Amino acid sequence: MAGKKSEKLPGKNQSQGEKPKLLSGGNPQIAKGDGDSVVQDYIAAMPGWKGDVGRCLDSIITRTLPKVQKAVRWNTPFYGMEGQGWFLGFHCITKYVKVTFFRGASLRPAPPVKSKQIEVRYFHIFEEDKIDEEQLTDWILQASKLPGESLF
């Protein structure tokens, strides 16, 4: 999380100008990289209604935390605070977008879906859901103040 920008290169099976491959569950295959640009590429490649969810999530996070750090690894956008690690990521599942709070068990109220990892909690957004921006903003603020994960 050094804040350095890395050059985005097309994925293994992607050449310049081609749409990213969609993996299992419709998750876009995006080359790893740091910064807003690669996250926007991921969001642009999210299929259908999931792209709207991705844009909404990114907007809420960026509006709430203007200095947030962004990266894509393992076909997942990550958000974190400089020097504190990563606090949130999201990716496409067949029927929903899974938002991961790495220290979600410490949030109040905790996001509703438990993980096998005791600290991790999930929030699933389905196509018909209306996004509760107030609750998400509160979770994002709380999560950004906790020690994040050093994932990469």
PLM features: residue spans?
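Charge-dense, helix-prone N-terminal extensions
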Residues: 2-152
